[in-house]
A protein has these predicted regions:
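Generic structural signal for well-ordered alpha-helices
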Residues: 48, 52, 77-81, 124-134, ...
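Metal-dependent polysaccharide deacetylase catalytic core of the NodB/CE4 family, i.e.
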Residues: 34-35, 56-155, 165-166, 174-188, ...
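Extracellular glycoside hydrolase catalytic/binding regions
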Residues: 190-195
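C-terminal domain-boundary segment and adjacent tail
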Residues: 25-28, 62, 71-72, 135, ...
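Bacterial Sec-dependent signal peptides at the C-terminal "C-region" and cleavage site
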Residues: 14-29
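Bacterial N-terminal signal peptides
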Residues: 5-16
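Active-site-adjacent substrate/metal-binding segments within catalytic domains
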Residues: 37-44
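Non-membrane alpha-helical structural segments and their capping/turn regions in soluble enzymes
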Residues: 117-124, 198, 229-232, 236
Length: 267
């Protein structure tokens, strides 16, 4: 009788135990070990010329943060629509991309687009106007926001507080890897990329895999088009690594990953 009980208990434990590999992949990242989000800012030509074809070639989806007033949005609107139809997120990067000109090193900020001269009402209205434009392009209502220049305050007021219900989340510019529980959905961390090699980009992904965290890349130029740039080879190497390890890495637009984080935090 004792042997029978012992056998039954052992069998139960064996059936309920999870392999180590499975234990590492359970969690908030779509049952994978980590999440990687590829974001591209400012609505520049190389997004459509270089990035979208590269992502589509390996069947990965990214997030493109569009400045509504950018001539590239108006001139190539059908291409942006097609990108959205293929699963890429068109995120909101404000209508005019206002940055705080009162901060050090902000000589590039024009008086018309100086966030420090804005009222909160104006900032919120312009972001909502850009949402209307984006909805006209892609027909979607759920999307994320990215702070122009990472600036979050106007006169000490966090203007996004009035926009919480308009977006799933907002992406910031502070580098760092975080678990789902650690993420601040009003200011998601991201790594700004400028000149890194493919090996360095892949290294960041490996750290996310090891720590079970979310990694958000913030790109501007890819193969040119912006002073903040990564070369095509490095970007291609990153995409190839992500594709080769897609069983372990969840690569998705910011809106999808943020929605998953929100659901995890609300449990």
């Amino acid at each position: 009788m004792n042997r029978l009980v012992l056998f039954s208990l052992t069998a139960t434990l064996l059936l309920s135990a999870k392999p180590a590999s499975q234990a590492q992949t359970t969690g908030p990242w779509n049952n994978k070990s980590c999440a990687v989000v590829l974001t591209y800012d400012d609505a520049i030509d190389v997004d459509l010329d270089n990035v979208v074809p590269a992502l589509d070639s390996v069947k990965l989806r990214g997030t493109f943060y569009l400045i509504g007033s950018s001539p590239v949005v108006a001139r190539r609107l059908p291409e942006w629509r097609r990108a959205a139809q293929r699963g890429h997120e068109l995120g909101n990067h404000a209508l005019m991309h206002p940055c705080d000109g009162s901060l050090p090193g902000r000589g590039f900020v024009t008086p018309d687009n100086d966030l420090s001269k804005y009222t909160v009402t104006r900032a919120v209205s312009e972001v909502r106007a850009n949402n209307t434009l984006l909805n006209a392009i892609d027909g979607k209502t759920a999307r994320t926001f990215a702070y122009p220049c990472g600036d979050r305050q106007i006169g000490g007021v966090y203007f996004y507080e009035q926009l919480r219900n308009d977006f799933v989340a907002a992406r910031g510019v502070t580098g760092g890897l975080q678990t789902a529980a650690q993420v601040d959905l009003t200011n998601i961390n991201s790594y700004m990329i400028n000149g890194q090699t493919g090996a360095q980009l892949i290294d960041l992904v490996k750290k996310a895999q090891q720590s079970g965290t979310v990694l958000v890349f913030l790109f501007h130029g890819v193969g040119g088009g912006h002073s903040l740039n990564v070369d095509l080879k490095a970007h291609r190497q990153l995409l190839r690594y992500l594709k080769a390890h897609e069983q372990d890495i969840w690569v998705a637009p910011m809106v999808d990953v943020a929605a998953k984080i929100r659901a995890t935090q609300q449990r």
